[in-house]
């Protein structure tokens, strides 16, 4: 008798993706971040759906509706904080997932990597629009500042900004369309994640050594299902701890003040996961230059495969490249810190140096070091 999971048209897809999938026997916990990302997306869609049942996307009532969710709706406070902190967890997993890809050379799977970069942009757009919805001070001014950056685009800039705003300032039309886009984008992200997996399963997973693992494969279930469950449980533990003990730790106190177009907050800053890009934006005194640097800070990921000069795929056996990778991580942490600081000495110069180092490491130092390592190994 044939097994249903191997013959049924729908079950067959799931079987080939999560049960009988041949996986390398030596993949480390750094390969675990795909499943927590999937769980994060499911948590965000479910909590978001319940929030949308009570939220109103009108400038007069948006702030009050969020207050109503927290005070009057059964476990509304829990749903709201799970959604807000779930986004932070999502980005932590995303950054670790991308970092793993860079360290172990997973970017050599071009389609998978490029869809991953597209996914990163989509998730960032979703998070930005979600931050605007509570209509607090930082929501309003964050939306104003970030959308205004598009005015730096020559010729069509100012028209484009007014088109996005739906008027001459961030107002009711902006809030309504941001809510609509914030609702639809996670489903687009889910579809892209499916395509991401599709292309990954065409090639099979990479592994820490960067060598072909065709000679030594094991089934995904039970080995990696149980391993992934551990990662997911740790994610849920971290998320629930954050939500139940310190839900406002990563938020901005300014967002507990209703939006007021007549009163600018002293320090306008985005959520913590955008601070590195915000620091790069602020480090360039020219508006258009800043916007280009901001976009390139993420888009540079797409050209990393073109800059791969090493004859080895992974950094596992390349100590100099490892050193540069960890300097890059430290640089990104520095940029995140600078993004949250006021624009004054010494933060300005630190931000500028960290921004230069970020691009210099990726575009110049890492490719040159890879060539040097090739020569050291007489390759």
From Swiss-Prot:
The positions annotated for binding heme b b562 are 83, 182
For the biological process aspect of GO, one term held by this record is:
mitochondrial electron transport, ubiquinol to cytochrome c
Question: Which CDD domains does the UniProt record give?
Answer: cytochrome_b_C, Cytochrome_b_N
Record InterPro entries: Cyt_b/b6_C, Cyt_b/b6_C_sf, Cyt_b/b6_N, Cytb/b6-like_sf, Cytochrome_b, Cytochrome_b_C_euk/bac, Cytochrome_b_N_euk/bac, Di-haem_cyt_TM
- Binding residues for a ubiquinone: 201
Please tell me where this protein is predominantly located.
Answer: mitochondrion
Q: In what way does this protein cross or attach to the membrane?
A: Multi-pass membrane protein
Q: Which UniProt keywords apply?
A: Electron transport, Heme, Iron, Membrane, Metal-binding, Mitochondrion, Mitochondrion inner membrane, Respiratory chain, Transmembrane, Transmembrane helix, Transport, Ubiquinone
Q: How is this protein annotated for GO cellular component?
A: mitochondrial inner membrane; respiratory chain complex III
Residue positions binding heme b b566: 97, 196
One of the entry's Gene Ontology molecular-function terms is: ubiquinol-cytochrome-c reductase activity
Where's it found, cell-wise? Mitochondrion inner membrane
Task: Report disulfide bridges, numbered on this chain.
Answer: none
Sorted alphabetically, which Gene3D superfamilies does this protein's record hold?
A: Cytochrome Bc1 Complex, Chain C
Give cofactor(s), names only.
Answer: heme b
* Cofactor note text: Binds 2 heme b groups non-covalently.
Q: How does it assemble?
A: The cytochrome bc1 complex contains 11 subunits: 3 respiratory subunits (MT-CYB, CYC1 and UQCRFS1), 2 core proteins (UQCRC1 and UQCRC2) and 6 low-molecular weight proteins (UQCRH/QCR6, UQCRB/QCR7, UQCRQ/QCR8, UQCR10/QCR9, UQCR11/QCR10 and a cleavage product of UQCRFS1). This cytochrome bc1 complex then forms a dimer.
Any further remarks?
Heme 1 (or BL or b562) is low-potential and absorbs at about 562 nm, and heme 2 (or BH or b566) is high-potential and absorbs at about 566 nm.
User: In UniProt terms, what function does this protein have?
Assistant: Component of the ubiquinol-cytochrome c reductase complex (complex III or cytochrome b-c1 complex) that is part of the mitochondrial respiratory chain. The b-c1 complex mediates electron transfer from ubiquinol to cytochrome c. Contributes to the generation of a proton gradient across the mitochondrial membrane that is then used for ATP synthesis.
According to its UniProt record, which protein family does this protein belong to? Belongs to the cytochrome b family.
What name does this protein carry? Cytochrome b
**Organism of origin:** Episoriculus leucops (Long-tailed brown-toothed shrew)
